[in-house]
């Protein structure tokens, strides 16, 4: 099969768009800042389609299964994997920030920090209890879940609908067929939206550089360097070991989703590629029922990059302000972050909000210290989002293999394929999926 010209590749288009965005933001900062609506518009287009894509994917996957116990097993194993990997990510961040000590020697006086810009992040009530978090998953109505676009609420509605449709058996065939046809339409729309990805990446990058400036990276470069290094370590060592144990290569996997990663790099949001990741995971041999459960759930429960960021940023602030933290205090911070990190959906800036809420709740680290990293948080969000995206993809394949729903031959064939089919036309996935409604 002949490869398309390089200029037609989404991969190349996004790279060029990001470079142009950086140059515009650097040399014409006011113009670059004015490009913000382009990035925001692309993210809004993606969010517009996420809820119905999740609904159709989950419903088709569950309703097409004959063994309902397997759905429960898949969900349970996915949550187990999420908790283990989130804990590992938090520990990796905690260990490396203590070893490298990027904040040591800064000797920042907390009283001199400008905290006016932190008001919107440190408002009371930002931190949810476990009960509040569980209650939040239940929408006021089925329509409300889709209107808000809350991923976990949509997932709950989708799972219940899928179970009910499967229970109907043959009587639900017409509904099942209708939802499957809607899926074709939705993934076609995703294909249309993704053609605008270079424009969105350009706008978001031009705004970021124009507003914050490349020079702002230098002042806190030690923290950024340590954070990016830790993310790379987690991806290629920790996740590398996980993928090797499950029969595939992390290097080939990252290469396979390179276009998605570039879009994430440009937009700083892992949510921007959720529909494409669903398509790619199915094309790699994971069954729709597994993909539909693991990918959306992972956007709240499996944010490895955000977990690394939270521990590193908290301890960095303590180091920079000469705030001593005992081992027990760091363990307490870790325990609290295991809960609060679940509230950081894959949206730009959510990690900073969770960090502010956590520091307010724990009390060991001065919340005013957040002013130190507010200016560079936007630049660290790229690494967070990239790590989150890769982590969720790996989680999907691992859980699929655990429950016997991963075609290893297809996985290796796709990873060895230089031009993956799902790259530009994710709707083709549906043509390859002949799902039948369970009796």
From Swiss-Prot:
Cellular component, GO annotation: plasma membrane
Which terms does the record give in the GO molecular function aspect?
fumarate transmembrane transporter activity; malate:proton symporter activity; succinate transmembrane transporter activity
Q: Name one Pfam family in it.
A: SDF
Report the record's Gene Ontology biological process terms: L-aspartate transmembrane transport
Q: Does the keyword Transport apply?
A: yes
> Mind telling me which residue stretches traverse the membrane in this protein?
9-29, 45-65, 77-97, 145-165, 185-205, 223-243, 290-310, 332-352, 353-373
Q: How does it sit in the membrane?
A: Multi-pass membrane protein
Q: Where is this region: Disordered?
A: 417-439
> What's the chief localization of this chain?
membrane
Localization of this protein: Cell inner membrane
Keywords recorded for this protein, A-Z: Cell inner membrane, Cell membrane, Membrane, Symport, Transmembrane, Transmembrane helix, Transport
Entry similarity comment: Belongs to the dicarboxylate/amino acid:cation symporter (DAACS) (TC 2.A.23) family.
Q: What does this protein do?
A: Responsible for the transport of dicarboxylates such as succinate, fumarate, and malate from the periplasm across the membrane.
Name of the protein in its database record:
C4-dicarboxylate transport protein
Organism equals: Janthinobacterium sp. (strain Marseille) (Minibacterium massiliensis)
